[in-house]
Structures are given as structure tokens and as C-alpha cells.
């Protein structure tokens, strides 16, 4: 299993219960993926993940951490050493806005920012702590990760936190509860505001926005924002956090092993296969965010469990074929 996030852990759980030895690899030093290194501690106590590790290890699951597949271990070796492989590496590639100023000092991507805060709480050595104490902060984006950044900055002691989103509140992709929590804690929302530039010479000085108005709906039912001419406005800020979401980051070795992708890099499952979550390489299974894009933890867990059931059936059928061949 590649990836010790929700999908990988769920897969390991079900495989072990079916008598299959599960080895879980992850590039981080602790299991959990975004459960550990993305979701803030005020939303998920980290000792819950540690307890889950103890339970899984007690069941027989083996964790190989601080190990990146394709870097520390070649995927070729994986294919030689294991009877089946599950990919649950999630989506960690940050989406950018594509506007001027994103590389200025004081601009941070959401996940490294959240990660640094969690590692500071863990007292991780050599952690580059990103602290918003006393700062005016603008968070760009309207999903749950944006809300995590808002609330984390406030807990660090930020002077002011703005959250800017190019649509209105009704069209936000994030949880209504998360927005409500952010409001109650003091976040000021800037609705119908689209960033077009992060301004400053070397360091962030503010964000230039244009107002938007909503028109016809897109294929997902959300109204499409269009720019209001002459509505440019600069809001001053000491720091900017970009939280536009994540997308898959396909590995270099995918093509070699016939791991097929859709137009945005998500792994495609063989829908005609009788084994759930099997890719177009019969030995490789995949689930979670790698298949459907950034989604809920419960969805990743569901797909990890489903993939384990597919792997169990695949290995069972292969064992029967091997026995039949041996008896010929």
C-alpha cells in the first residue's frame, strides 16, 4: 500500500481482517496523511490517529515510513515483491491562481502553512514555523482548507483575517458549518472578490481584487463569476495564504505500468473489471483522492475498503488458478 492516509489505512484494515499481509509505505514520519499533517488539531485530535496506528500494528499491519516510492524505493521493486499494490497517495499538488505576485515573500500555500503549524505543536525538530501573530492576513479560496487556514491564523494571534472568494456565500464549495465557525471566530469574508495580483516589491503589501457578479450556472450548478469593470481595489496585508485546492500529481512511473489518467490527472479505474477499484494494470488498485480528486475523508475510507475487497477477490482467484495449474 502506497500512502498511509485514510484510503491506505482503510485498505490495510480490511486486507488484514481477510488474512492478507499488508505493508503500508508513506513518505512522512507518521501515518494519517492529511489527517495528521493537514487537518488542524482543533478539528481532529492527533492522538486518535496514533491510537489507530497502534490498533493496526496490533492486527499485523507493517508501516514503512519516511520512505517515498519512486525515490527511496523503485516502483519496479514493488511490482516484483508484492502480489498486489494499492495506490492511495492523495492529491498534494497546489492549485495556483496564475497571477502576478504569487512568489513574493509572505505568500504561502495552504498545506505547507497548516503543516508547519501542526509540526510546531508536535515540536518537530528543524520545522520552519509560519506564524501569523500580529499580522493582517488574507486567505484566498472558499473551500474547507481555506477555513482551516482562517481559523489557524486566528489561533496564532493574527491581527486581522480576511477570506476572499470570487462567488457569493451560497456558491461556496466549503462546508456551511466551517464558514459559520470562521465567522463566529472573527474572520471577515470578502464575497464576490477575485484576486488579480498580489502586490509588493519583494514582500507582500496587499492583494489587488476586482468585484464579480454571478451569471449563468456551470455544469456543477454554481453560478459563473464575471468581472465588474472599473472595480479594482487593493486590500493591505502582511501575509497571503493561497488555498485554491489540490489536484493529482501523477508519478513518472505511471505510464510504464499502464496506470491511465483522465484529462486532469486522476487515475482511471477499469469500470469493466470484476475487481473493485482495479486499474488498467490488473495488479494495481487505486482509490481515494487520486481517483476522484480532493474529497471527504469518509469517501477515501469507503474507497480504500472497496479496493481491499477487490484485492482480496483478485488474490483469491489467482490462488485458485495457481492451484489448478499446479495440479495439471
What are these regions (language model features)?
Residues 149, 290-315:
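A conserved FAD-binding loop/helix module that cradles the flavin
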